[in-house]
């Protein structure tokens, strides 16, 4: 969530200024509208990440989405004033799809870690998203936009490697109900 939601929060806060400073002649309102495409992808992408996790597996889905996120940010690092603005917006929205879908994929894993602590684990995941945003925006205060995007891509690459060590949940987990009976829940 550090790399997914953290980068979303950071990018959403800097993207209008990035467009304004990168493309001559844009008004602040137009730059903001163009940048809103990044956040708009959330409506479709986040549920899609969760759905894909349920259908094809959590580890595989998270791996593909994190890799796509890293590639997307590498592409964003190449945007300059010579780019055609619609192409820059499309690249931004494509990157955003992987970011937002990755968030859904992260939360597909959360209830399988320790079912009785799902709320606490979800809260910790959310907190790490905020920590990611603070870290990325701190980096942005010292570097240019291109380097900022590359730092996010590099951190996503590290997360990609870490995901490869994740055990894919399989079989069933036991849930003890209030009456003392045990219910088995399929996790595949």
Q: What are these model-predicted stretches?
A:
Residues 45-57:
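Helix-to-loop junctions at the C-terminal end of transmembrane segments
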Residues 67-82:
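C-terminal ends and interior cores of transmembrane alpha-helices
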Residues 116-144:
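A late C-terminal transmembrane helix in Major Facilitator Superfamily
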Residues 101-114:
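Intracellular juxtamembrane helix-capping segments at the cytosolic ends
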Residues 1-43:
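Extracytoplasmic gate region of multi-pass secondary transporters
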Residues 39-47, 130, 134:
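Residue-level signature of mid-helix packing/kink "hotspots" within the transmembrane helices
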Residues 153-182:
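Multi-pass alpha-helical transporter architecture, strongest
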